[in-house]
Amino acid sequence: MSDLLNTLGIAPINSGGFGGDWVGSGPEVEVATPIDGSRIASVKTVTEDEYEQIVGQAAHAFNAWRNVPAPQRGEVVRQLGDRLRAAKRDLGALVTLEVGKIAAEGEGEVQEMIDICDFACGLSRQLYGLTMPSERVDHRMYEQWHPLGVVGVVSAFNFPVAVWSWNAALGAVCGNSTVWKPASRTPLTAIAVTRLAEEVCRANNVDPAVFSLTIGGGSTIGERLVQDRRVGLISVTGSCEVGHHVAGVVGQRLGRTILELGGNNAIVVTAHANLDVALPAILFGAIGTAGQRCTSTRRIICHRSVRSELVNRLKRAYAGVRIGDPRQPETLMGPLATLDAVENLMQAVARVKSEGGEVLCGGDRLEDEAHPGGHYVTPCLAAATNDLAIVQEETFGPILYIIDYGSADATLAQSVDEVEEAVTLHNAVPQGLSSAIFTEHLREAEYFVSACGSDCGIANVNIGTSGAEIGGAFGGEKETGGGRESGTDAWRAYMRRQTNTINRSTELPLAQGIKFGD
């Protein structure tokens, strides 16, 4: 472990703030791995005075960065992507160590950063406005998009670096600087990535405060960032409760937000589904990252005619899930991130039973020698109805609810009409992030992605709820928050729109033909 940390510039005790210089004289936070509870390193958090210094430096960096031509900004971001690519294996290993993701997912998160850097570089030559015809003679009207300023990014523990990159890479090519507040329980990957960004900036004679960092408590540093009028846009990944608070605070100062909050994602499995395709998608969605993704599959809305076969196949698959040290290549599910997460899962399992559902398998703690530290559980499969209170909530862990729809003796033709019932159940939760349907029938697929279908920001056909690509806009509706990260036009969220009218005549005609004065 020490070789890995040394390679990435992680010391036994690290400064938790960066705005061109590394600072941190606040309380020290010890970071332990959920793999076995052992210490990784410590971080000195930033004080409120240091926060002021960092945001001031980020604002100063913006003043110069916004004047750099966008394609040149894109080149800097491209180089950051190359630097991340070279460090992919080491950074992925640190994600695994800090979060508990299996090795493939740790490296996959780093690949997301690489992908968005490549994507943002391409967009740096496409930050275009439109020219509109003017109703006035010898006038031209057009729009421009200008950099917004300082962008604040509050990321969550489950994707400790990828979500930052979605905002920072696009924000940077748009001419903004970024102040990043990562989750306090996963700060080391943030420090490692910021060090790489610093190297790239210095190599290009760019003020490295373009990529600033503030590690501290949510109630102190996080709250300062949300309230700060110098920060024009706040992107927050977190719970619905946190999102409501942030939206209220930022709304009071008429700032902008991108909110990626809770998900209660469902897969509809129809009578026409190919279960050979559906099964691995369900498994990856439900137990990947130990069920700690915003897009994790929480519900299966299954046609009664295929329920028995699907449940039996899921039980066999769950029994074969290899749970343990995520650094080992054979492991499919690692630990939950915290002991609180374990307790929340245990409470959810108990509530399923008390509210009238049935636990079909799993939902137990693993506390033997092969699973040290108390963070390991078996994934839970439960039968439930959609209206159970626990089903309406998001439990951030590997619990999957099987919910029935349709008639067991319906003909295949009749079952197509029953997809409306499935969609009604699907949409009857407060959240609206990601969704999917598995079917070989065109009518069912088209209905699901129509205006009458899924009410989520993401709706897939024959692919699961997890595993979004950079080219698609990511975000949701309802309690999931609103706003989008990544995607073809997400850059507009990081810029301000300006309309320009140019008069090349020697007169001053007014719009709408208004006559004013003599």
Report each predicted region and the residues it spans.
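Hydrophobic face of amphipathic alpha-helices that form TPR/SEL1-like repeat modules
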Residues: 1-36
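A short acidic/small-residue loop/turn micro-motif
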Residues: 23-24, 45-49, 273, 367
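Conserved C-terminal structural/oligomerization subdomain of aldehyde/semialdehyde dehydrogenase
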Residues: 36-42, 205-206, 231, 268, ...
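Residue-level signal for inorganic ion chemistry
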Residues: 37, 73, 95, 117, ...
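Glycine-rich loop-to-alpha-helix module at the N-terminal edge of alpha/beta enzyme cores
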Residues: 38-127
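Generic secondary-structure signature for well-ordered alpha-helical cores
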Residues: 60-64, 82-89, 100, 122, ...
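Rossmann-like NAD(P) dinucleotide-binding subdomain of oxidoreductase/dehydrogenase enzymes
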Residues: 129-277, 413-416
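ALDH superfamily catalytic-core signature
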Residues: 196-199, 241-386, 407-416, 461, ...
